[in-house]
Amino acid sequence: MSHIAVERNRRRQMNEHLKSLRSLTPCFYIKRGDQASIIGGVIEFIKELQQLVQVLESKKRRKTLNRPSFPYDHQTIEPSSLGAATTRVPFSRIENVMTTSTFKEVGACCNSPHANVEAKISGSNVVLRVVSRRIVGQLVKIISVLEKLSFQVLHLNISSMEETVLYFFVVKIGLECHLSLEELTLEVQKSFVSDEVIVSTN
């Protein structure tokens, strides 16, 4: 095989690899279609995934350490026996949120030039919607804030359009959580900025 044919085959394989990488990487990580932009975007995406894995592994370790050590003998726990624990969620001042909310559901929002954060009660969970420009590493920051506040992430969806990103969370309210919805949105907003003036509305 001639040198020209070898080079042509190498370029073809490289283009196929780049095409595969681009299809596996969210579009907002790749600003242009050239090789450097694709590889750079993939590296950023992998770094953020690695950070997310570290957060989840840390969460798993904490759950393991907090697991009761006494044996259960494979007994079945009836839902009725958990009623007090599952229904009395100490989500403080929820009554005030319910009476002042302008949403059709119980909700609050907190906006800044950097992000719009909205939280709503949905059954025993909270639906959190965050719209912002793309910031590398921001997803990990939000998840860290939620875990610090005793929320458990049940579902996460990410969508984007050019430089704008929408993070959609469904989170479970932890028994140790004592925040109102307004305080939750404010804490998430703080993960974006530290010195900006943040306006909270409900």
From Swiss-Prot:
SUPFAM superfamilies (UniProt xref): HLH, helix-loop-helix DNA-binding domain
Protein's cellular compartments: Nucleus
Induction: By UV, flagellin, and jasmonic acid (JA) treatments.
Role summary: Transcription factor. Together with FMA and SPCH, regulates the stomata formation. Required for the differentiation of stomatal guard cells, by promoting successive asymmetric cell divisions and the formation of guard mother cells. Promotes the conversion of the leaf epidermis into stomata.
Reported tissue expression: Leaf epidermis and flowers.
Name of the gene this protein is made from: MUTE
Name the UniProt record assigns to this protein: Transcription factor MUTE
Matches recorded under InterPro entries: bHLH_dom, FAMA/SPEECHLESS/MUTE-like, HLH_DNA-bd_sf
Matching PROSITE patterns: BHLH
Domain bHLH: 1-49
Recorded GO MF terms: DNA-binding transcription factor activity; protein dimerization activity; transcription cis-regulatory region binding
GO biological process: epidermal cell differentiation; guard cell differentiation; stomatal complex development
SMART domains for the chain: HLH
Higher taxonomy: Eukaryota, Viridiplantae, Streptophyta, Embryophyta, Tracheophyta
Subunit structure and binding partners: Homodimer.
This protein's GO CC annotations: nucleus
